[in-house]
Amino acid sequence: KIKVMIKFKNLKFEPRDMGGVGAKHTFDNGITISVQASQFNYSTPKENLTSSDDFASFEVAMWDEDGEWVTKDFVPDAGDDVLGWQDRDEINALMLLIQDK
């Protein structure tokens, strides 16, 4: 069976109550990735825009089915459970790592 890999382009971004946009996706292995951009997130630009197309980078976090942070499992040198200013290629690489776990 061929496994279809989920990538950035497959994320469903929605407007957030506080402004900006965000997407969450839970993979078959139970890991969830959150990709957010707004004036409150580590994104470029740091503004409340209405489309993911308007952002060059995003804030990313990952957790398992128990709600435990797993960001550092995939990015060992991350200084935090949240990764700032991740571009589409970096997010695609993270998403592929998650799906290979």
Annotate each predicted stretch with a short phrase.
Residues V4-K101:
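Catalytic phosphate/metal-binding cores of nucleic-acid and nucleotide-processing enzymes, i.e., regions
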